[in-house]
Regions:
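Phosphodiester-processing cores and adjacent nucleic acid-binding clamps
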Residues: 1-168
């Protein structure tokens, strides 16, 4: 039975450059993407872009489009850090993403580089080099967007409990 091919790129991937998250090498990631027939694959390590040179080389050798990105940690007040995937669309986006990631390294908390809304606006907001040149997506259940959904779910649960108490 032939394995089905991936029609789109694999866009949320970590390698051993991601602290405490993956033991996979860049080569293994690219080999797996090729095996699945993916036309593109993204490298979105946590808080760093240190593997992008090997990644680009491996992708070129495999005939796969490399998408360079990062899974950034964004400060959310006292709630700790939220995750946000940022991927460069082109050279301008790559430069902005590199500068953003470098600046987050100066803002460590518990060993993790952290960005904030100010840095996001500086590098990706209107009038910046990265504006329109970087794609942002929710990362995981700890992501910026997922946290909004989960917060709304919590509010909905509270409303339903109140209704049950009123009806009971």
């Amino acid at each position: 039975m032939e394995r089905s091919r991936v029609k789109y790129g694999l866009l949320h991937n970590h390698t051993m450059e991601s602290r405490r998250d993956s033991a996979m090498s860049v080569q293994t990631l690219v080999d797996r993407a090729k095996e699945l027939g993916a036309p593109a694959v993204a490298l979105t390590d946590h808080g760093v872009m240190t593997g992008y040179i090997d990644f680009a080389r491996c992708c070129e050798e495999a005939g796969i489009k490399p998408v360079v990105g990062v899974e950034a940690y964004i400060e959310e007040g006292s709630e700790g850090r939220k995750h946000l995937i940022l991927m460069s669309k082109n050279d301008k986006g790559f430069r902005a993403l590199s500068k953003f990631t470098t600046d987050t390294q100066h803002r460590l908390a518990n060993g993790f580089a952290r960005g904030n809304k100010e840095l996001l606006m500086r590098y990706f907001g209107p009038g910046s080099e990265g504006h329109g040149n970087v794609i942002a997506t929710s990362a995981c259940v700890q992501g910026v967007l997922a946290s909004i959904v989960l917060a709304n779910r919590s509010v909905d649960d509270d409303i339903n409990k109140l209704r049950e108490q009123q009806d009971g």
